[in-house]
Amino acid sequence: QRPEYPVWREKGAV
């Protein structure tokens, strides 16, 4: 599964 937007970015793990 590959989301269009970076989910790891939403978690704040950038």
Curated annotation (Swiss-Prot):
It is an enzyme of class 3 (hydrolase). GO terms for molecular function: cysteine-type peptidase activity. Signal peptide: none annotated. Its EC number is 3.4.22.-. Belongs to the peptidase C1 family. It comes from Calotropis gigantea (Giant milkweed). This is Calotropin-DI. Keywords: Hydrolase, Protease, Pyrrolidone carboxylic acid, Thiol protease. The modification Pyrrolidone carboxylic acid is found at Q1. GO terms for biological process: proteolysis.
